[in-house]
Amino acid sequence: QIWNMEGFGSGNQVQPGMCAYGATKRAVNYVNKALQKEVKGTEVQVCTLSPGIVITDLLLGDYDTSSPEWEKSKKIFNILGDTVATVTPYLVDGILNADKSGAKVVWLTGGKAFSRFMTAGFNKRDLFADL
C-alpha cells in the first residue's frame, strides 16, 4: 500500500503564506489519481489519508500567539481541530481496514465540520490549554 496525506490545499483552499505547503498538498490528489491508474491490475494499492486540522507544532509554528489573527484562528482551530492522540487511532484503523486502491480515510468530514459549527456555542473546546 502507498498512503499519501492530504492537507490544506488538497481541496483547492488558498491562503496567503501557505503557497508551498498548499501546492504540495494539491499535488497529492493528482499523484494519487495518476498512481492508481499506473498500478491498476497489480496488487499495489494507492490510498489517501485526510486527517483534517490536527494541532501540531507544524500548524502552530507560523503564528504569533499574541496577535489578533491568532485569536481568530484559534477559534476555528478549537471548533474544527483535534489532537494527534484523538485522530491517530482513527487513521490507523482506516489504514488497517483498507482493502482496495483508492481508499480514503477522512477524519473531518463535511458532516462533522457542519455539526461542530452548529454546536460550537454549546460545546466549548480548548485545545490550547496546555500551551
Where are each of the predicted segments found?
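C-terminal helical subdomain
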Residues: 48, 65-123
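Short aromatic-enriched loop/helix-cap "lid" or pocket-rim segments at secondary-structure transitions
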Residues: 16-17, 58-62, 117-120
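N-terminal charge/polar-biased segments
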Residues: 122-131
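Short, flexible catalytic-loop segment of classical short-chain dehydrogenase/reductase
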Residues: 11, 51-61, 65
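Catalytic loop of short-chain dehydrogenase/reductase
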Residues: 1-33, 37-40, 53
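Hydrophobic structural elements of the Rossmann-like NAD(P)H-binding subdomain
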Residues: 3-5, 46-49, 59
